[in-house]
Amino acid sequence: MADWLIGIIMGAVEGLTEFLPVSSTGHMILTGHLIGFDDDRAKVFEVVIQLGSILAVVVIFWKRLWSLVGIGKVTDGPSLNLLHIIIGMIPAGVLGVLFHSAIKEVLFGPGPVVISLVAGGILMIVAEKFSKPSTARTLDEITYKQAFTIGMFQCLALWPGFSRSGSTISGGLLARVSHTAAAEYTFILAVPMMVAASGLDLIKSWDILSTADIPLFATGFITAFVVAMLAIVSFLKLLSRVKLTPFAYYRFILAAVFYFFIM
């Protein structure tokens, strides 16, 4: 298959699934397997196109991101600030640094991904069933305690297949944060976390990179960016009408497909 087509297909899958609670890792592994793109180059490619998805968040939430560092103000009252983000980053950041190699060796495989797809789906159903009325209906109403709770749930996203948004939105619901506010916080929180993780992976995989792969990486990056933009905007609108449960059932189906076609 031509590199440009691989770039478009994989970039579209990454952009569509990175911020939905369905596991981008599971979809990337499955798609790569189906089109025969699953070598060492593919691993570096996935890191690069993740940056395209991150750029989509930066573009959509640029005013909010500027306000976090004291440039501009999105509301006259109390608002989300940089400390909310730092608090949310600490749990997964610490675990990620301490156990980065172990996570890559133990959890990056078909078996662990199938388990996490199912476990993540169950978590989402439980969160919907046992969540109480929201005390934080907007992003600016999130407390430091709620930010820390969401950050703790983000630790689950270190397990490939669990889904960052699925884990953190579920944590937000259990901490009495609304669906939309939890999702928006999740997307903003993902920017520093994913940049750090992708940067670390790129440094460790630098010797695999080749100038011959630039067209492939560029195509995937641009595709992931465009599709992620559309996916984020659509998902935020959808959350006001549809809860996490349908995504949980989809994860169960994906786990079955993964089990029969990959394992």
Curated annotation (Swiss-Prot):
Bilayer topology reads:
Multi-pass membrane protein
Location of the protein in the cell: Cell membrane
Is Cell membrane one of the keywords? yes
Transmembrane residue ranges: 17-37, 42-62, 83-103, 106-126, 142-162, 183-203, 216-236, 242-262
For whether the record's keyword set contains Lyase, the answer is no
* GO CC field: plasma membrane
A Gene Ontology molecular-function term?
Answer: undecaprenyl-diphosphatase activity
Q: Which UniProt keywords apply?
A: Antibiotic resistance, Cell membrane, Cell shape, Cell wall biogenesis/degradation, Hydrolase, Membrane, Peptidoglycan synthesis, Transmembrane, Transmembrane helix
Supply the EC number(s).
Answer: 3.6.1.27
Question: What job does the chain carry out?
Answer: Catalyzes the dephosphorylation of undecaprenyl diphosphate (UPP). Confers resistance to bacitracin.
Belongs to which family? Belongs to the UppP family.
Miscellaneous comment in the UniProt entry for this protein: Bacitracin is thought to be involved in the inhibition of peptidoglycan synthesis by sequestering undecaprenyl diphosphate, thereby reducing the pool of lipid carrier available.
Any one biological process term the GO annotation gives? cell wall organization
Protein known as: Undecaprenyl-diphosphatase 2
Q: Supply the enzyme class, top level.
A: hydrolase
Under PANTHER family, the record lists:
UNDECAPRENYL-DIPHOSPHATASE (PTHR30622:SF3)
Please give the catalytic activity noted in the UniProt record.
di-trans,octa-cis-undecaprenyl diphosphate + H2O = di-trans,octa-cis-undecaprenyl phosphate + phosphate + H(+)
